[in-house]
Design a protein with these regions (language model features):
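Short His/Asp/Glu-rich catalytic/ion-coordination signatures at enzyme active sites or charged loops
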Residues: 1
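Hydrophobic alpha-helix feature that most strongly marks membrane-spanning transmembrane helices
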Residues: 14, 21, 110, 124-134
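Domain-scale macromolecular recognition modules
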Residues: 44-122
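Intrinsically disordered, low-complexity regulatory tails
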Residues: 129, 133-182
């Protein structure tokens, strides 16, 4: 029983670390409002009254790879979940830093094979949108979206995956600006 409580506590800490990272890197009020709504839904905040009910949620970060593939990056746990479980499709490639808070990053394949250069760029973006952005040789797991699942009891943005590969990336901070979709 104590072991179960400790395991549950470790999951809570991991989840709250991802929320902290998202708050620290939130690009604006819309993203913070989404995080507030998530925390309310999880019972961490007792109430939340949005200032502007008509404000639409922030969109994913959007990039275009050197090979012409769209790369989408979630801004917070709710967006990560929406991106991975609802927007992305089976053969799209999903990237995430291994064992570290960060954004889900998806290459939209459109049914095409994804070149190595685009995979490298997506892995770079996954690192740049994570708590490991200043790291060296950061481990990034990637797999097809069809290998990702969510089970009951997992917090928003938390997923399970298998049949993955791992790339080791030293981030290039200038890459995100080069690939940003206009």
């Amino acid at each position: 029983m104590l072991v179960d409580l400790l395991a549950e506590g470790e999951k809570e800490i991991a989840y709250l670390e991802t929320v902290l990272y998202e708050v620290e890197s939130a690009p604006g009020e819309a993203a913070l409002n989404e995080i507030r709504a998530e925390l309310k839904g999880q019972g961490y905040l007792k109430y939340y009254k949005p200032r502007d009910k008509k404000q639409k949620p922030a969109d994913f970060y959007r990039y275009l790879s050197s090979d012409g593939f769209e790369i989408l990056v979630g801004r917070n746990n709710l967006q990560n979940e929406r991106l991975t479980l609802h927007t992305a499709r089976g053969r799209d490639l999903w990237f995430h830093t291994k064992n570290a808070p960060g954004s889900h990053t998806v290459v939209m394949s459109g049914g095409r094979d994804i070149p190595d250069r685009t995979r490298e760029e997506a892995a770079q973006l996954a690192v740049l949108h994570s708590s490991q952005a200043k790291g060296v040789k950061v481990a990034v797991d990637y797999t097809e979206v069809k290998n990702i699942r969510k089970t009951a009891g997992l917090k928003p943005g938390m997923v399970l995956y298998d049949k993955y590969e791992t790339a080791y990336i030293t981030p290039d901070p200038t890459l995100a600006e080069k690939l940003k979709k206009k």
